[in-house]
Every structure is written in C-alpha cells, then in structure tokens.
C-alpha cells in the first residue's frame, strides 16, 4: 500500500482515522492491535491517536515496549511507558531482550532483535511510528550503502508480520514537525533518547547535518525523495507480482520444478529463487550465494546447501527445503527405538494408520513391537521376493538424504513388519490392511 505524501498534510485525529480507513476498510474491531512504544515522541503520539480512534470506533489497542538494555536510562524508559499507558488506560507488555551484534552494527542488531520479538507476539496489527522524515532518511541510507531496489523502496506502509499479522506505519504521510505540533497541542509527555543526537550514527548524521544542507541547497528536496520512494515502491510491487506468477508456474505441480525454472532468463531465475526461499521461511542469502545455487541447479544433477538452520537439496530435477533437524534422526527416535503396543506408540508419534490394499493385519497392531529407523540388514518381502529396505526406498525414489532416517515398524523380536509410508511385508500383509504413514516422511515421486 502506498501513501501520498503532501507537504500540506496536517496530523489530526480525523486525518489519522482516514489513514486507518484506507488501510482497514472494515476497521480494527476484533483485531489484536498494538503500538510499539519506545517512549519517544513519535510512538507516544501514535498510541494517543490510536487510543482516541479506538474510543470512537470501539476497539482497544495495546502497547508493546522492547527493553534493549543498551542505555543507562533503559529502566527509566520502561517506567515512563508504564506510567503513560496507565494514564491512557491501555495495557502494556514490556519485553527485555539481549542484543548481540553477530557481525552487525549495534543499531541493526537491536532492530533485528526487536522485529524478532514483534513477530513472536501474535498481533494481528502492530503499529510503528515511522514518519515522513524517517522515510527520507531510510532512502538516503540505502543510497549511501549501495542498496538495491528493495532497500531504496524504503519502508512500506504495510508489510507481513509473522504468520498472520501485519506491520502498519500510519504516520508515513506526516512529518516530524506535524507530530511535534500534535504533541504540543495535546500536552503529551515523552522521553528523549540521548543517542538520537549522536552523529557517530550514520542516520543521525543524515538527520542533523547532511539532509538540512541538501534541503537548503535543493528546493523541495524531501518531496523529490518521497516521489522517488513512491515510484520505486510501485516498481517493486510490480516486480513482486511477476515473480509470484513465475513461482506459481515453477511450483505448479506442488514442488520446485528445475526444468521449468531453467526456461527463464538469469535475472528472473534469481528472483524466483529468492521468492522460493522467502516463502519457505529461509533467510535469503547474499547475491553471490544465490548465484552459486543457480549455477549448480543449471549445471549439476544434485546439490546441497546449508542455509541458517535449513538445508536445500537438488535431486531428480527438483529443489527441496528441509529444516536441518528434519534430516537428523526423528525426534521421537532420538533414544534409538520405541517399544510397546504398536498401535499406541504409532498414534502417539503422529503416525496415521491408513487403509492399504496390502497392509498389516489390525490384530498385529494390538501386539507389542518396535518403532525404529531402518538398518542396513533390514529386508521385507515385496511380491514374494525379499528386498533390502534401502533398495525399496530407492525404488520408491525416496530422497537419498531421508533414507537413513526412515521409520520402520518391527515385531517384538525386531523382525521388520512395515516400512512407514511405503509398504508392509508381503508375506504377512492382508487385503484392506493398515499402513503406518507419517507426515514428515512423504513419498515424493
């Protein structure tokens, strides 16, 4: 969603409510809504506006304060937020976090931690108090750091948060001065972060030195920047529409089809890969890493990549994503084997007992047995011939990296009875019997 930036915009409750209606035509009633409250002027004003709008419309917002512990005054800020929320009659949740740089600057690390907490809280709508001047600064920072289209498009008014929520920035149409004027008019208190004047931080250098000089030299400089941001956001939105359509075609059969992906131009292939990773919850790697993935998909029949807690596998013309723990021994088999009543231990560990033309007799599942992973010596009768279970898995075209951890059902003497999701031993199978099926071990071909 794009906002129009107008120099004559004045921040009033009516103007704010119009922004709310533009974004949420059905209103916020029934939505779990919160403001990220730092105690600074911008978030103080935003919470006041949302509380006033809520009184008119019949919804009650909450507030969320992230205690980073980076300032010696951090406890004072938390106290201020609690007192301010008490004054407004809204609930406040304060979350203490430990900021670790992990190769990032302190600002970026704090922001990363903050947004991670935002995503975990399960809000339908989380309102952030970024305004028009913040947007200009964000664009200029992206220019200075060599950002691409996504960085130069700066901050969207609305973007996804977690699984089902959204981040909403309703103050983007308004300037820092508009917010000051509103606060003075309503007598709102606030605290000042001492780091906001520290020009050792690049954003503050832009705010206090570079942007004032550019604005003095170039008439309507801020307006020009915002026009650029709006145009770039439109280009980005169009690009994302095209990429989504491309991905739907590449993954149209329910999986990432490498042959289909190869029909695209190099640029579109890169964007499809990036979108595929993002849709699967994988942090998108840098351009060089994406290029390496694309090269292997193009030139080799197989490939494997470790990506921050995930594994990407290229096999048989398809690209697969697994959480790293999925490729370790199943959690329910971490101690090696599970013994007991077969029906009980299978259902307790998320197996579905499905009807199968050649499945296990139901009476057999009422007996004691063993649940474990396959062993090199395991065999099952298939069509009257005993086959090694790993050959059976290979014949089913189970992914090679899943074969060593595949679940097997055995009797109390450890004789294999059935290979999960695949087949039961033919010599003991019955018509319309039972085959144990686990959702984490799909037969993909």
Swiss-Prot record:
Primary location: cytoplasm
Catalytic activity entry: cytidine(34) in tRNA(Ile2) + L-lysine + ATP = lysidine(34) in tRNA(Ile2) + AMP + diphosphate + H(+)
One GO-annotated biological process of the protein: tRNA modification
Enzyme Commission identifier(s): 6.3.4.19
Residues the entry annotates as binding ATP: 38-43
Keywords: ATP-binding, Cytoplasm, Ligase, Nucleotide-binding, tRNA processing
SUPFAM superfamilies: Adenine nucleotide alpha hydrolases-like, MesJ substrate recognition domain-like
One Pfam family per UniProt: TilS
GO molecular function: ATP binding; tRNA(Ile)-lysidine synthase activity
Top-level taxon in the UniProt lineage: Bacteria
Protein localization: Cytoplasm
Annotated GO CC locations: cytoplasm
Family: Belongs to the tRNA(Ile)-lysidine synthase family.
Record remark on domains: The N-terminal region contains the highly conserved SGGXDS motif, predicted to be a P-loop motif involved in ATP binding.
Cited PANTHER family: TRNA(ILE)-LYSIDINE SYNTHASE-RELATED
Function: Ligates lysine onto the cytidine present at position 34 of the AUA codon-specific tRNA(Ile) that contains the anticodon CAU, in an ATP-dependent manner. Cytidine is converted to lysidine, thus changing the amino acid specificity of the tRNA from methionine to isoleucine.
This protein's name: tRNA(Ile)-lysidine synthase
